[in-house]
Amino acid sequence: MLPAVSAWLHHPLTRNSAFMHLWAGQTAAQVGFQVGTLATSAIAITILHASETQIGVLSALQTVAFLLVGLPAGAWVDGWHKRHVMIAADMARIGALISIPLAYGLATLTLTHLMIVSALLGLCTVFFDVAYQSYVPIIASKRYIGAANGRLEASYQVGHAGGPGLGGWLLGFVAPPLVYLLTALTYALSTWAIWRIRAPEPTPARTGAPLLAQIHEGLSFVRGQHLLFPLFSCIAAAAFAGAGVQVLLPILVLRTLDMSATQ
């Protein structure tokens, strides 16, 4: 056996069943989010014939929750059981996703319906992401938090890179609304994996402080860190620029260049 593989298999995190279940659930959710994002653009462009402005609004709805709810979500999740939040977010996403192929089969699918589902998916993703990031210190010892976050980030990058490719390949075989069934399956796998975690979770601390005070405390902490604040600023700028590309690329490929989703 290769030394690197042996070291990975015998790493304490690999033998930590709670972390491995969280990792599996987060990986499935990341892939599902990326596949669903591509399917949403394909439906809007090829089936509902949405305009560029409407596609822009649709794409914004998928990410606006991170801007509007990201900070309050962090404060709220601090006072909730993280595992319960992740399971609830996954189940809500499953219900929203299944409604798309259902409406498509009944010939009642509209752009408004798609926008509502996109906004709901974005909202649930915010709470899921905040909860799993806050859950890592609970199930992994302080010594291995860096390694745990490294594995989770690797899954995010793999999902970000491979999810659209998988979604494009699937769109070559089935109608875009039916791809949502696979996306719902990934969230079902995520729900199952996280439900299997049996690690005890401490009772959430409820400070009783007003929501705005909790948000201000978090922002003050980030601003006071010489490494965190520049990193936060770079990530925010990259996410803003990347969102613009994600809006324009499907329009360019599917409408302007008249290419298939598989291509």
Where are these predicted regions, by residue range?
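Alpha-helical transmembrane-bundle signature of multi-pass membrane transport and export proteins
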Residues: M1-Q263
